[in-house]
């Protein structure tokens, strides 16, 4: 998993709490979420033997209210989880489900009743910059795949989960295409590796402004570089 995004730095959990009262704002609920999470569908996923159910259990253990599967240049992780659930439900309806399968299905239902899981992907844009696109769970997976194709991810790599997929789309164009598709657009780890505002970036001020203040960009994920977490 990557950074939790509720106006916090990478690796810091934001507990659910009431926002402090101010003269000009009503009290609002705050939630702990992780909108930058990889799964075994990403080629560089480090852990072996991890099931999608394990990812949901860990999210529940950490007190998260929502997570987004944002694998590299693919929506395959989210698709694989949904397909597993669909298969389990079909076996249940046909009466051919085993006790172990029924237990998994019931666990999925319990967790998904408590946890919002959003589909998305992490695009590798031109010059290696990363951009997240996160969608409503009602969005058809085909729509998300077509968005990847519009971003010039090769059709043959749509399910590969590769971090490098050749020449895709420049950052600002990626923001626009993602927003037009209905995505929440986030620049991940913006001030560190592959981030649009990383230190030592050899671009001018106008480019930095465009990369960080474009109207189609909805949020920046930043990293606390001094933290050991």
Regions picked out by a protein language model, each given a short descriptive name:
Residues 11, 15-24, 80-216:
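Extended substrate/RNA-proximal surfaces in nucleic-acid metabolism proteins
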Residues 32-42, 72-73, 191:
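Histidine-centered catalytic micro-motifs
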Residues 33-35, 67, 117-119, 185-187, ...:
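Hydrophobic faces of well-ordered beta-strands that scaffold small-molecule active sites
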Residues 38-50, 194-195:
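Acidic/histidine-rich helix-loop elements
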Residues 55-79, 184-186:
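Divalent metal-dependent hydrolysis catalytic cores, especially in the metallo-beta-lactamase
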Residues 227-229:
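Functional cores that coordinate and move charged inorganic groups
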